[in-house]
Amino acid sequence: MIIPAIDLIDGQVVRLYQGDYEQQTTFNLSPLDQLKSYQAQGANLLHIVDLTGAKDPTKRQTALISELVNHLDTPIQVGGGIRTEAQLNELLEIGVSRVVIGSLAVKEPELVKSWFEKYGNEAICLALDVNINEQGEKIVAVSGWQTGGGKSLESLVEEFKTVDLKHALVTDISRDGTLQGANTELYREIAASYPEIQWQASGGIATLADVNAVKDSGADGIIIGKALLIKQFSVKEAIACWPNA
């Protein structure tokens, strides 16, 4: 599945390089028009990251996200600094289909597991942002990638399998926003190890060949941000490579 994505800072469409707020590119685009275009081209799921909210929870862009949800028919998943149940609940109440939770799952797994039990495994997607070290270990980063988390991807997945984890988004931080191609080896490995989880691949997608490579890796979906914004290819072309299931 092709999952077009936009990142938002203060209401503007942006891209960060490897998650670094100091390396920001701002696009002169309307978030709604951009998402409407992705919807019109056949996207079945849209992905929004609230980067302002990720950095400062008091400045969450909830009003804008609510407006986007109200003007689109396609299901939307939203991430960016979810730290409390109230924030999760607020997003679900305004019509977001699935909320992406990252750092908190590393820092407070018991709390996040209780949300899986309360809201169900369709409502939450775990975001596992990994740094792969020289030993090949997949270490999950936290806090907008500003600090290392110290837990391995596998240990977190095992922990959340106890609450029927179904959706997980995995980013190789070294590839994000770089257009260097996806880490297909990573996706092949985790899809083979945990076939019961719907894996969303993210980071580094530059060409339709990358889309095909991720599809062949066994991932269930691919999040594409920058490549679409700079018109490397269109959503329609990507879906032609990887038709919606």
UniProtKB/Swiss-Prot annotation:
Gene3D superfamilies, A to Z: Aldolase class I (3.20.20.70)
Principal location listed in the UniProt entry: cytoplasm
Protein name as it appears in the record: 1-(5-phosphoribosyl)-5-[(5-phosphoribosylamino)methylideneamino] imidazole-4-carboxamide isomerase
GO biological process, one term: L-histidine biosynthetic process
Keywords, comma-separated and alphabetical: Amino-acid biosynthesis, Cytoplasm, Histidine biosynthesis, Isomerase
GO molecular function, one term: 1-(5-phosphoribosyl)-5-[(5-phosphoribosylamino)methylideneamino]imidazole-4-carboxamide isomerase activity
Active site residues according to the UniProt entry: D7 (proton acceptor), D129 (proton donor)
Biological pathway: Amino-acid biosynthesis; L-histidine biosynthesis; L-histidine from 5-phospho-alpha-D-ribose 1-diphosphate: step 4/9
CDD domains, A to Z: HisA
EC numbers for this chain: 5.3.1.16
Reactions listed under catalytic activity: 1-(5-phospho-beta-D-ribosyl)-5-[(5-phospho-beta-D-ribosylamino)methylideneamino]imidazole-4-carboxamide = 5-[(5-phospho-1-deoxy-D-ribulos-1-ylimino)methylamino]-1-(5-phospho-beta-D-ribosyl)imidazole-4-carboxamide
GO cellular component: cytoplasm
Pfam families linked to this entry: His_biosynth
Enzyme class of the recorded protein, top EC level: isomerase
Similarity comment text for this entry: Belongs to the HisA/HisF family.
Subcellular location: Cytoplasm
